[in-house]
C-alpha cells in the first residue's frame, strides 16, 4: 500500500513537473545515443557504420528478454512506503548514467579495431538493455499510479513530452555548438569534447531522476501481480490485442522516422551543407516550436478529435513534407531547416499524446481481460520502441555503408548527396507507415476510449 501522504496529496503541478524531469533524465542518455553515437563511432573511433548499426540492432534484440523480464519484476513487486514504481528511479539512476558515459570514451580511439567493437557492444548493452530498461519501464508504468483520471494522465503525457523536448533542446542545440571543430576547412566531430559532454549529461540525468523521485507521488494502489511469466502467452496477447499491436507498429515506425531524422542530422548538416551551426538552429527551432505549438494544443485537439485521429493526420502531413523536400533538394540550408522543423512539429503532436495512448491500451486490456498489467504492457511497448531504435540504427548504418561513407569519404560529392537522400526518404517511409498502422490496426477511437473509461469507472466503484 502506498503511504498516506501519497494517497491524500492531490494531483497537481508538483507531479507534472516531477514527471517532466523523469523524461528529461531519460533523454539525456537516450537522445545523446540516438543522435551522436553513430557519428562518434564512425568519425572518431573509426568503426564502420554498418558494424555500428549491426551492434545497435543486436543489442536491441537482447531487450526481448530484458524488457519483458523487467516488466514482470515491476508487476510482481509490492508497493513500499515510496510507492511501487518510484524506488526504481533512485536505485538505477547511477548505473544508467555511468554506462552512458562509458560509451563515449575517445581515449580508446587508438586501441585495436576489435577492442573498440567489443567495447561498444558491451557498454551499449549495459546502458540500453539492462540499466536504461530498469529505470524507463518503471517510470513509464508509474503514470497510471499517479492518477486514475484520464485527463490527469493526458497532462502527464504532455509534461513528459515537454521534458523530452527540453532535453532535445539542450542536447540538440548545445552539443553541435561545442562538439564540432573546423579542421582544414571541414566541420568534424571532436572526440575529446564528446567525452566531456557525455559526462556532463550523465550527471544531469542523475539529478533529474532524483528530482522526479522527490516530486512525484503515487496515489493509485497497484497490487503485486504474481502470475508467472509466459513468453508464449505474452506474444499471443500482442497479436490478439489489436490496440497493443497497433500502438507497437506505430511506435516502431515512429522511432524509425524520428531517430533517422535525428541521426542523419549529424551527417546532413556538417557534411552536405557544411554547417554545424544550422544543426543547432534546427534543433533549437524544432524544440521551441514543439513547446509553443504541440504542448499547449495537443491535449485540446486530442480531446476534441481523438488521439488516434490527431496522430494519423499529423503523420500524413509529415510524410508529404519529407517527399516535397526530397523532390526540391534545396541547396539553401535554411530551406532544409524549414522542412526539418515543420516535420518535427507534426511528429511532436504524436509524441505529445502517445504516452496517454499507452494508458488507453492498458485500460482497454483491463476492460477485455479483467487484469491490469501496467508493467508488462509497458515493457512490450518499450521493446517495440527499442526495435524502432535498432532498425533505424541498422538501416542508417547500412545505408551509409551502401553509399560508401567512411571518415575518409565523408565529404565526397556522391556520398554527401546520398546522405541528403537518406535524410528525406527514410523518415518519409517511417511516417507513412505510422499513419497506416494507426488507421488500419489501432482501434481506440475517441468514442471507444470514452466507453472504456466509463466501463472501468463503473467496475471500480462496485
Q: What residue ranges belong to the model's regions?
A:
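Membrane-embedded alpha-helical bundles of multi-pass transporters/translocases
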Residues: 2-462
